[in-house]
């Protein structure tokens, strides 16, 4: 079991489901108890406030799992600012996050694809022992999973990180940021995209060079693998140079 630096916001009450359905980018109403779904909390301009996993814990209670513990308070504050007359409580929780590689470990646990292997994420209300989360970095990077503070921040468009494929429903009702997200989808592409890079060695900040032109920078790296945002015209299997070494692109 590996500890995670996650944040938790509990949203509960008679209007919790309807409120979250109007606030986040993916469908909430169809969630069963114990089921989780990836979503985003966005600004009106379609920028990311917080990547989320929305977990239904009871009929009228949900837990929003944020990428880092530092995102819990901003997430709660953004939701409270939009609550108005909705009958729901919005409370950050000081819980401990964990991921178990392999079998399901807890009564409420949800599967995660963040590490490219079978894994289940859960939380506990009291501290418990677990391995250091840095042990998961090679798996995360090789799987092409973006992390807040590395590949994700409030300047990134969801489509640049590939989150439009996993965190957004284009058929649900309105939510903040829906219009710019839909316009970008109609346009057909973004100018840069997150890619996996097969490279002997790299460091965050290294330039990614293609046809003698800087087309991106490395955001995360471990031995043999890296992530970075690269101009969209570079082919998914293109050969680039990173830190003086030849490297090959892969889609994230």
Annotate the PLM regions.
Residues 1-49, 58-59:
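Acidic, proline/glycine-enriched N-terminal capping motif
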Residues 15-20, 71-76, 105-106, 125-129, ...:
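Short, conserved charged micro-motifs
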Residues 48, 52, 156, 161-168, ...:
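Glycine-rich, small/acidic residue-mixed loop/short-helix segments
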Residues 120-193:
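Anionic-ligand-binding alpha/beta catalytic cores of soluble enzymes and soluble regulatory domains
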């Amino acid at each position: 079991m590996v500890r995670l630096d996650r944040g938790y916001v509990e949203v509960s009450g008679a209007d919790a489901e309807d409120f979250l359905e109007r606030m986040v980018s993916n469908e909430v109403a169809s969630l069963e108890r114990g089921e989780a779904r990836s979503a985003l909390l966005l600004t009106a301009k379609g920028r990311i406030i917080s990547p989320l996993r929305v977990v239904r814990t009871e009929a009228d209670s949900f837990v929003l799992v944020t990428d880092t513990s530092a995102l819990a308070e901003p997430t709660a504050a953004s939701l409270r600012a939009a609550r108005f007359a909705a009958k729901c409580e919005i409370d950050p929780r000081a819980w401990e996050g964990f991921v178990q590689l392999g079998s399901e470990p807890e009564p409420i646990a949800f599967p995660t694809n963040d590490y490219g292997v079978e894994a289940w994420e859960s939380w506990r209300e009291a501290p418990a022992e677990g391995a250091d989360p840095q042990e998961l970095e090679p798996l995360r990077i090789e799987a092409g999973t973006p992390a807040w503070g590395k590949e994700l921040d409030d300047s990134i468009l969801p489509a640049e990180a590939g989150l439009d494929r996993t965190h957004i429903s284009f058929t649900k009702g309105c939510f903040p940021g829906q219009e710019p997200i839909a316009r970008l989808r109609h346009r057909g592409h973004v100018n840069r995209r997150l890619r996996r890079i097969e490279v002997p060695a790299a460091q965050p900040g290294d330039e990614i060079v293609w046809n003698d032109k800087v087309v991106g920078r490395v955001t995360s790296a471990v031995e043999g693998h890296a992530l970075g945002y690269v101009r969209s015209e570079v082919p998914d299997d293109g050969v680039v140079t990173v830190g003086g070494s030849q490297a090959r692109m892969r889609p994230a």
